[in-house]
Amino acid sequence: MSPLRRFRRTALSVCLLGLLAGCGRPAPQRPPETVRDLIADLDLAEIQREPGVVDLGTPGARTLLRKGWSTDEGDASHHFVWSDGPESEIVFFLAAARDIPLILKGSPYPAPGAPAQAVTLLLNGTSVGRVTISGEEARTVLPEKALRSGENRLVLRYAWTRSPFEESGGKSDDHRRLAVAWDLLRFATGVDEQGRVRGAGGQLSLPFGWRIDSFQRLPPGAVLAMDDLRSRGGETGELRVALQPEGGAEREVGRLQPGSGPVVLPLGDAGTGPARLSLTALSGKQGGNGLVLWRPVLAAPHAPKATAAIPQTATAVPASLRPAAGPRPRNVILYLVDALRADHLGCYGYSRPVSPHIDAFARQAVLFRHTVAQSSWTRPATTTILTGLLPRTHGVNGRRDKLSEQALTLAEMLQARGYHTAGFVTNGNVARSFGLGQGFETYELLPRKHSAATDVNAAAAGWLESGWKRDAPFFLYLHTVEPHAPYTPPAPFRQRFAPEVHDETLTGMRVFHRLEDGSLAPTPELRQSLLDLYDAEIAANDAAFGELIDLLARRGLWEDTVVVFISDHGEELFEHGGWEHGKTLHSEVLDVPLIVRAPGAGARTVQRQVQQVDVAPTILDLLGLPIPPVVEGRSLAPWILGQAPGDDPDAEAYSWLDQHGFRAASVTTPAWRLIEDRAPNAGRSLYDRQADPGEHRDLADERAVRTGYLRAHLLAAERRRKGALQAGTAVFDEELRKQLQALGYLR
């Protein structure tokens, strides 16, 4: 009998018992809904196992290391990792608390005259002994009384540290505080290190000493159901089932014995937020193979369909929220300002008066307060804006990636409806060579000179005068490069916003290269100078944007044109230890402005979180044109026209970074941002966007349930979209190469 059939029968039996007790006729029972198929969604779960040999200096060991460790070193024959600082921390999982023998091997820093390196072991905050590290194996036992089922923290506290810089009298540039070069840790847990969690053919195999964590919201009445639980290799063992609601303590729900037939285990109250369901295979004795769960699912009698699935990006807008029929604007201008942070505009709360024309435009438009970029560098983000596809779908993520000809761009969609299309761009990353000219009758990469935004205006004015045939509406894409580095504002704006900056080397790319390689220190004075130059460039672009608005008014186009003002990404100004963009996925590079002026729409501020992928469907909707099914964004036209509700606390935006050695992914909600750094030896971080908008306090460990829940959503988004389009490889001509070098993308 299947677990769901058994669940229905159990529910019916309860009602029959109620009848016998005189409770009246039972209400009809709905079949239970599957909240999660634990085999189908195994790739969304987190899997842990008890530690065995931790080979320090290898990527595999990094999953256990937290603070107090340097980078991996060595070669194929010998690898190690230095401690860095007075303590090093290790986090490891145990299926069950018990005495664990531990072997430690490392070599102390070779400091002349230094005493023996004594290392104190603190386990979950309790001192459990001391070992001397001498290059040979040191042995101890981690006592059961200080251990616990689940996560454990082991801190290695060193008797002394030394700095190579100080030891060499300043000749070394190594400022680390070193104590031990660690080779290995060996936990004698008896875990099968070659084991693996497998899910296939309706069977979920879980080795002893391993755990599966599944993250989801559970509706009332949720149960764990499976056809059977069996053991492998003759071991007895049992399955420990535990549940941890967000913000609450983990509680054991039950222990299941193999061979007892179909299972329906009520999970109890999980609250309304995310919860972690943990399944741990416990051995009846040390060693053994593990357990097999047959067709395991999470189910509930009245689970809403939305609970069962990871939220999808939606393009459809309910009929009740569709824009009302009536006159439609004819033309569209997409004005993109490269590398512009939202928080450096007055209309977004910035105190310096760098954006009076943009602010005036915002007062007669719809300002989206929270807009998330799909990447932190130009090409993937702009490709998303121009296609309505997420980076994992359009495939344009790397330095040489070119948009597939199979992709359908916004320009092509409008061209097919009779629109004249033109694009004038100033960043080589969106040159025709990268496929972004698809659907444009005219598409020009302008050379950078003077104020690039002014050049763009001149090109646009010329096209409106002589290139645009007034027999049909137009779509005009204008991509301005300032305030993208290098910061070279025109003299009037530099004199106003950066009058104290006299060092001309700050207006080239070399200053950023030196900051990156450490040959130039980011002093407060230097940081302020660069910030002033950045603001001066914003002011220059603002003035040019004001001229464009005046041009539209003079040409009689203002009342018949949708104007979309947006940025591709922001700019880091050393908030997280770096400069520019394309290196992280923090707020300063992902939070961008989006201001839309649609004739007749009025002015308002929308608090709902939106994202760049929404721009293309929004433009189509405002024009009264159909949105192709391939488009992944959601039309914002109902919010622009004041016909939709406000905030959505569960709205999610996904962003990716995969270029020049920087690899990361993130999911952003109005309350949280999870960043998963996918570089070697990296991890994940979680930030409370309300309490910590600057994203400086990592809560990933403290809020592990929320972290796992958001990560599952991120992985599900990637699973749905991976490999949708295959990017091509771009070919650079010499002129494009020079442009990319000038912007710092090539050296």
Tell what function each PLM region has:
Residues 11-21:
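Bacterial N-terminal signal peptides
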